[in-house]
């Protein structure tokens, strides 16, 4: 714990994650010192009652605490990580292209996080899917048309915030410009500034116009703007403030990610991000308590050394406090919206009805860090036998007496999946349907692998 107003302001900028179903002891001094927020992950979730108890315990220590979560719907869910999301993700909503339905789904997601005491949803993803090869965006994007993405980002923001949960559009100024994963490296986007204005920025402008209370920066270097990752580049956050007129909270993506920049470690990255204009510093869940506490100390020491102004730290803390004061989460249940959206997002070609008893072969690529390992699949919804294969696994012998269902995931990025497709198969693509197999019995595109998406596909396959 640090002493005095500067230390409290520094604590207000921090949003750490932590392990476990309860509040760890090391977090309590930070809460007492005015910690701004925490970010919950699947590792903090057992069931709604437990999460509600956890958030209540945290706020008993710090009543103004913001509690954030990545609850995007579809492939990225924390509250339903064990079962899969009851709501489809952005690509499915973009495929339907009904902004009223997107608004309704977002309100339903907001209502579910509100019910357990969460008041900041790190959604929607506002990245345009410029490169289908990108693993970090993929089905998390509403699509490849900037105007379509913009109108659905606005609708999602409006839906979330209609139930008093703050939206945080991400990843400014756009992660869809590069195929690299910023969890693992610093991606570089070489598009000219005018191209960014035409292609990447419209969804973020729409989010600002819709009243989004927060925006998250990308750990991507945009050569048209500067030499640093966007999170620590004053030109990038200046663009957000001046050109888009955004006055809300600017939050960083997790600073322990490889793409965050700052060779001096997490504390140095935090100082650089604040100096660049960020307000809230996401620290993820993989840092030690000493690293989190050290980040607060690093901010104070940077001010004392004249590398960061005290006014900047207090300005950031003020924005965190203003967001906390704005939130008023109101529980709201509407899972029917998720089922409707998932059904409408399905694209079916050919005879997809297999009934019960099919052999289901699920081809699973390595998971992304953002989505995590899926714990559910289509096979369990269809009955019969399910075989799950990773790259390099030998396929099972085919039994021509029963139907074959092949479940793919971003086959356009994985040649090994494409090589296993046979003409007799009903092929179900649960990722971005950028590759369409020829001469198969049927092809089904779900536009996502959330439970709602897979349930909709199962209804079609069972008949």
Where are these predicted regions, by residue range?
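Preference for extracellular/luminal or secreted protein segments
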Residues: 1-33, 262-463
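N-terminal hydrophobic targeting/anchoring segments and the immediately downstream early-domain regions
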Residues: 1-67, 74-81, 405
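Second-shell residues forming the walls of enzyme active-site clefts
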Residues: 17, 43-67, 75-79, 144-307
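Short acidic/polar active-site loop segments enriched in Thr and Asp
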Residues: 36, 119-120, 213-214, 279, ...
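A charged helix-plus-loop insertion that forms the helical arch/lid used to bind
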Residues: 83-97, 141-143
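Alpha-helical scaffold segments that flank or form the walls of functional sites
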Residues: 97-118, 200, 209, 269-275
């Amino acid at each position: 714990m640090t002493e005095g107003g500067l230390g409290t302001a520094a604590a207000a900028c921090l949003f750490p994650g932590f392990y476990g179903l309860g509040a760890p002891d090391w977090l309590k001094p930070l809460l007492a010192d005015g910690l701004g927020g925490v970010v919950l992950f699947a590792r903090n979730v057992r069931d709604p009652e437990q999460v509600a108890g956890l958030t209540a315990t945290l706020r008993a220590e710090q009543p103004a605490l913001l509690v954030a979560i990545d609850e995007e719907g579809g492939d990225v869910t924390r509250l339903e990580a064990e079962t899969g999301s009851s709501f489809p993700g952005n690509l499915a909503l973009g495929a339907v292209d009904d902004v009223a339905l997107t608004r309704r789904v977002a309100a339903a997601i907001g209502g579910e996080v509100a019910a357990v005491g969460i008041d900041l949803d790190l959604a929607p993803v506002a990245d345009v899917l410029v490169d289908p090869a990108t693993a970090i965006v993929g089905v998390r994007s509403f699509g490849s048309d900037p105007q379509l993405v913009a109108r659905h980002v606005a609708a999602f923001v409006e839906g979330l915030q209609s139930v008093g949960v703050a939206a945080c559009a991400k990843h400014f100024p756009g992660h869809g410009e590069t195929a690299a994963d910023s969890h693992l490296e610093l991606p570089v986007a070489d598009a000219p500034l005018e191209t960014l204005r035409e292609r990447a920025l419209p969804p973020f402008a729409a989010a600002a116009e819709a009243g989004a209370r927060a925006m998250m920066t990308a750990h991507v270097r945009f050569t048209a703007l500067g030499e640093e990752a966007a999170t620590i580049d004053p030109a990038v956050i200046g663009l957000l403030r001046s050109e888009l007129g955004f006055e809300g909270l600017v939050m960083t993506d997790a600073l322990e990610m490889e793409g965050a920049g700052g060779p001096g470690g997490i504390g140095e990255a935090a100082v650089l991000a604040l100096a660049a204009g960020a307000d809230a510093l996401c620290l993820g869940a993989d840092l030690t308590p000493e690293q989190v506490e050290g980040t607060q100390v690093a901010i104070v020491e940077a001010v004392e050394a004249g590398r960061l102004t005290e006014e900047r730290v207090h300005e950031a803390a003020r924005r965190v406090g203003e967001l906390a004061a704005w939130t008023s989460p109101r529980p709201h249940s509407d899972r029917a919206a998720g089922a409707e959206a998932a059904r409408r997002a399905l694209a079916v070609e050919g005879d997809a009805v297999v009934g019960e008893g099919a052999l289901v072969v699920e081809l699973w690529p390595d998971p992304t860090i953002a989505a995590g390992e899926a714990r559910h699949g289509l096979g369990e919804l269809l009955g019969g036998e399910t075989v799950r294969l990773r790259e390099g696994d030998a396929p099972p012998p085919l039994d021509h007496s029963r139907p074959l269902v092949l479940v793919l995931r971003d086959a356009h990025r994985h040649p090994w999946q494409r090589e296993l497709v046979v003409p007799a198969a009903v092929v179900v693509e649960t990722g971005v349907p950028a590759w369409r197999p020829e001469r198969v019995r049927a092809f089904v595109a779900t536009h996502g692998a959330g439970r709602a998406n897979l349930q909709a596909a199962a209804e079609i396959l069972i008949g």
